[in-house]
């Protein structure tokens, strides 16, 4: 009887230790996922100059550092026990080209390297790449223009305007047609465009594993800001 009681005490003690260890990991996990991350912000038109080049021509995405530099990424809500917080990730690893003829945007493609998107937590970045976005299998996301867009009315005086673009957005290997209004700014030799594109991750086949302490909301945003210059 004594031996049996001793075994029960040992088993009970081990169970308590395991439970306490798991409880101790919960705040650690929350701290890893609950930071706001790194978001791609909108256009900063402060100090913008009048356009110094014609809008027609071949334009390419530039990744030169500085104000309104090219960036793309995501923003989603993380659903924590009793709380809801936003988390963003971004990258400057973006390529793209656009063609404007007679004041009409006739062709355009933008490619984002998903494997280089970062938040502000290395552990979270690794989990997002491997377990959510599966970047080894789907390393790129793209937007391809499918309808011409009138850009002839964009202001030339260094103030921002808007342009509506329609195209195929492909994430996780799955394309969806979207129509989105972009803010656009002609300043000096550059054109800057920005939008926060609402998406439902399930439309792109992006599932999330069953996290212990947090889940990711279905609805979120693709944040994109492109700095374009004339093709040399």
Question: Which positions does each model-derived feature cover?
Answer:
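Low-complexity, acidic/polar, glycine-enriched regions of mature
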Residues: 2-232
